[in-house]
Swiss-Prot record:
GO terms for cellular component: extracellular region. Residues 86-88 form a propeptide. Expressed by the venom gland. Keywords: Disulfide bond, Pyrrolidone carboxylic acid, Secreted, Signal. This is U1-hexatoxin-Iw1d. Its main location: secreted. It comes from Illawarra wisharti (Illawarra funnel-web spider). Belongs to the MIT-like AcTx family.
Amino acid sequence: LKFVVLICLVIMASTSAQQCGDETCGAGTCCAVFSQNHCRRLSRMYDLCSDHADASPSGNYLFFCPCEPGLHCDRNTWTCTEGSSRSE
């Protein structure tokens, strides 16, 4: 039974992680591309951000991570805000 639990934990950890250059990004982070790839935390309220739709095919973002859950990236200011994800 302990072996089964261990296998489940390994599978859960591997599905929530993202390879980012030589690093593996965990939950609450993304792979942001500068001159090299770096794991960064998801953007918070008023932080600069990338839109979820702007991810590369490999799942990387240019410069900034998307916003953490409950926020959206305002395409006018490129900052995380609350409310509707539509630009007005």
